[in-house]
Amino acid sequence: MNLYPKTLIILASMAFSFTNCYATHHSEIETEQAGTGTTALPYSSPQVPESILFCGKKIDLTRFDRHERMDRELLAFAYMHSTSIQTIKRANRYFPIVEPILKEYGIPDDFKYLMAIESNCSPLARSHAGASGLWQFMQTTGREYGLEVNKNIDERYHVEKSTVAACKYIKAAYAKYNDWIAVAAAYNGGQARIAGQMNKQHVKETLDLYLVEETARYVYRIIAAKIMFSNPAAFGFRLKASDLYMQVPYKEVTVKTGISDLAAWAQKQGTTYALLKNLNPWLRDNFLQNVSGRTYVLKIPVQEGMHYKANSIVPHDKRWVVE
C-alpha cells in the first residue's frame, strides 16, 4: 500500500493546527524567546510621581538622581511579589496596633512604612546582624530604650512595647535633627553618622547626601512602601478583603510570678503552647523566669474568633483591596 499521499495529508493537517494554536497563543503572550522554550511575560514599570508628601514635607522627585533612585525601589516592590503581598496582608493586623502608638507619641503616621520595610510587618523578623522584631532593634539599642532583652524574654518581639521604644528613639533623633527625613535616614545609618555627613558634605537636605548604598536607598524604600500601600492594584496586587490577615481577638492575663511550664499553663488557659507563643513571641523559652517579680501581660486567643470566615475581614485601608 502507498502511504505517501496520506502522510502528506496528515502532516498538512498537523501544520495547520499548529499554526492556528500558535497564532492564538502568540496573541496572548506578546513575545516568545526563540529556541529557549520559554515565554516572556508582559512586565511594566510603576510610575514615579513628580513629588510626594512624606511626614508633611513635599519631596521633589523630578531631579534625575531622585527619579532613578525612586524608580529602583518601586520596581523592587513591584516584582518582589510574594514579599510585597505578604507585607500588605500582615499590615492589616499590625497597622491598627502601631498607628495609635505613633500618634500618642507625636510621631508622623508615615513612620509605619519604615516599620514595614524593616520587618515586612513581621514581629518575628530577625536580620543576619541580629536586629529583631517589627522595628529591628539590636539588643543594646533595645535595652537603651526600655526593652527587656535576655535569653528568656526579648521584648523586641513585643508588638506594642517595641513600637513604644521605636517612638522614643525617633523622638530623640528628631530632637537632634528637627527634620523627619533625616530621622528616617538615621534609623538606618545611625544618628551620629548622618549628622557628621551633613556637616562634612555641606548639605542641608538629607536626600542630597552621598552615603553607603544601603542608607542611600533607605528613605526611598520607605517612600516606595507608602506609594505601594496607597494603591497596591497599580503594582498588580489585586487583593480581596478575604486575602488580608485577620486581627486575632484575645484576652489578657496579668502574671506577676514565674511560670515553670508554659505549655501546661497555656492548657489551663484553654489554649495551646503554639498559640500562646504566636500571640506572645517575646516569650523566648518554654518557661517564664520572673526573679525580679515584674508584671507581664500575656495574650490568650479567644476561641470563638480564631477562625477565618467569608466576608468577616474588614480592610484596615480600603485602598488595599479591589472589591
State where each predicted segment sits.
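Second-shell loop/turn segments in exported
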Residues: 77-88, 98-101, 121-128, 132, ...
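Primarily a LysM-type cell-wall glycan-binding module
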Residues: 240-270, 322-323
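Substrate-binding/active-site groove segments that recognize
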Residues: 129-150, 163-165, 170, 194-197
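Short, functionally critical alpha-helical segments immediately adjacent to catalytic or ligand/cofactor-binding
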Residues: 107-124, 183-190, 276-279
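An acidic, Gly/Ser/Thr/Pro-rich helix-cap/linker signature
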Residues: 3-106
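LysM (lysin motif) carbohydrate-binding repeats in extracellular/periplasmic proteins that recognize
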Residues: 261-290
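Extracellular LysM carbohydrate-binding repeats and other cell-envelope/extracellular binding modules
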Residues: 279-317
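Catalytic and binding regions of secreted/periplasmic enzymes and modules that target cell-wall glycans
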Residues: 170-197
